[in-house]
Amino acid sequence: LHRVPGTHQHLRNGDTLDADWPTDEPTNFDAVVMNPPYSQKYDAKESLLSDPRFAQFRKLPPASKADYAFLLHGFYHLKNTGTMGIVLPHGVLFRGGAEGTIRETLLKKGSIYAVIGLPAGIFFSTGIPTCIVVLKKDNTNRDVLFIDASKEFRKDRAKNFLEPEHIEKIFNAYKNRADVEKYAHLATFDEIEKNDFNLNIPRYVD
């Protein structure tokens, strides 16, 4: 699978959020890549508040939207020197309540490294716009890079496609971590705080 030999794969069938990864196997990883079901309902039972994946945030994501539950699950299993990328709907960037509290905590810790807006209609399962949230545990500052790649794609009938040149532009902006007019902006923590920890991309890239 994706050039990873079968001997290096460990697959389990179960409810990721209800039953965490077994402790008799490696539980922290250099890279975590996730594309979970968007805004799926889950069992937000009170006992999860003592689960180490969620305990430090003191609030559970709402039962009607498991987006941040998946994010925190993956983030917990990330090594301190690792990088995580998760594809999520844009609502995670600005919704309030418990999600807003979790987002604010992550930002204050410097854990959110970048937000990349993707074109709508690039996944076969949904036509809604999505974004990639990149997280790190060892980030030395609290700046966040915003990339708006939502307008650059090839359209083919009912689907949109990212071509190599589109991916390369995203990669270069991510690597350089600098402003690109109408495409990328490196926002300071003060700027984000003044926006009440709202990460909606048009607030930073217009």
Regions from the PLM with identified roles:
Residues L1-P26:
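S-adenosyl-L-methionine
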